[in-house]
Amino acid sequence: MKAEPHLASETPHDKVSCVHAETCGGCPLIHLPYPEQLAEKRGRVVGALSRFPALELIYTSAVEAAKPIAHYRTRAKLMVGAEGAIGLYARGGGHQLVDIEHCQVLAPAIVNVVDYIRAMLRDQASALGKLGVQEQDGAIRAIDVREVIDEVGAPPKLLVTLVVSRDVDLEPCKRAAEALVSHVPEVAGVSVNFHDGQSPQVLGNKSTHLLGATSLFDLLGRTKHLATFGSFAQAHRGQALAIHNAVFEHLKQLGRLSELRVLDLYGGSGAFALALAAEGATVKLIESFAPAVEQARLAATKLKLTISTECADTADALKLAIARNEKHDAIIVNPPRRGVSPFAREAIAQLSPQSIIYVSCNPDTLARDLDHFTRLGYAAASIKPFDMIPLTEEVETLAILRKAQVPPPRTIHEDEDILVIEKAAYEPAVGSASTPLSLTSRVRSIPGMSEAICVTRVDLATSGLVVFVKRPDLLDAWTKALDSESARRIYIAVVRGITPQKGAITRELRDGSRVHAARTRYRRLAVSSGHSVLRVIPEQERQHQLRRHLAAVGHTVLGDERYGHAPTNRYFEEKNGLDRLFLHCVRVEFEHVRRGQKLIVEAPLPGELRGVLERTSGAGTLKFLESKNALGHGGSSSLPPTPDELHDRGSALDVSATPTIIDSRRSSPEAAGDGRASVIYTPPDADDKKVD
């Protein structure tokens, strides 16, 4: 049953061959020469940044190449299937497991222990009982193997985790642990992790140590830190060191390392914090995963280093740091794929460091966050990608942000009375003591606009058009004009599920002790990955009217924490970086007070929302919506236009008086008001089109 050692072979630096390449989904770029892989990864970073006007001119450096590109991975999370198959799911989706017996990217020591576990599971004489694979009435679901090297040139050691169902008998697990330690010299410790039922995550939140070491020092980056079962590890040792060196080179530009105060956010088990402490810096680590914080503290004690640690949610910890008036010269952020939360971004800027060092594993959320930091007064000084996981589409990026002037907002329309401004999500229209930077403060920074006043508003987590008057004496007249029945605001929303083609929702909404009549009209423009892209028009603009009405009929706005569907919101944040409402005020129409003409102003769909649509359904949905002029063009026009202008435009945002019929469809109990609801649907137009 003993597996033969699986040794690394010499591999040309620009090409790796694998017998599993056609079926395994683990290395999608393996067919490309290595220089082309690097070009594709740089293109991914450039493409993500180019969605945002504030970032599209930032230069992205060439990708730092990895050496080696084979047998480099320090950690493997592999699924276990029938007859002891161990590997990854096949490319193309689904749950067909590919038994990977000759993986070209795993470190040789990891390959050896995986081979032994495979042989052990297939050996009917092993007496493992219920530890057998789940598809054969056993309990094992997956394995997680971490390679640890504590000194340069030292032989590797392994920490092995067996992922099992919660009701498994631990005796067979203990026998398996004893067999692993006895037959595979590299195995230093074994634990069992209990999977959380139907969770898509490989690891559950509870583990039990079985045998051997509970943690080991690992040299990953510039110093050692403690590795334990299931803890995060950068995939490539050489690239981890390259990123650490680049971070330290930047910090040296701020002053002597021994004199710097550094805040390490999403600090994990202390890879950055411990390395900085070794240079004499004053370091504070914040991490929400308690076992990782404990490992950082223990490592600091063993290495005789001083670091401050705090186990807390990042945004909550930053609020306390602001209240304590903490001062930091630099802040390092190394978040998971979903990026930095909006409130954490605001708090980081309020702490006012000289520099923000952002290490990202997801170009899409990096671009989203850099766009927000730009509005908060931190501009990207450099963008450097690293090939952390060769042969895959993934790319690690180091962004250096420095203090800069807060830019003025984008003005879509300006005349003698008003400004129509494009507001970003999580930018308050009017400031407060806790959020002194606001859209109003940015508008008033424009020369000659010191008296500008906001007339219309949208929700904090909504983006889109906001109207300002230039002087206080204009406020009353323009407030009446924008509240009149002829004025209209049109939104683009993506909502959960597939709605009818057209409809109207009439429902009274309660505001404290008062009840208000309210009506919302919508039209489905497209379907994206099972969810509806809508043009939505509130007729009265009550508080949260669109969100409450759509929730009332069971089609909540994606990203709506208050009225929405929590599992769907979590999925879209984790998988697609949607950390806001998918709701954008794309168009405003009103009669100009001074000119008497109807003015139409549009703001294009922001980059983060375009990215979500592209990731969920490919470029087809975006192209279709753009062909219908449904996503806004970033300009203004007056009515009446010439007949030719009206014909050429043909926008899906134009509203026609289509006859309606009443449908007896029942409203959802998610309704956010107390009044009676009626739902009215219109027959679909002949040119209505669905894009899946």
Regions found by a protein language model. Name each.
Residues 542-550:
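Short beta-strand segments enriched for Tyr within beta-sheet-rich domains
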Residues 18, 24-27, 361, 541:
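Short cysteine clusters
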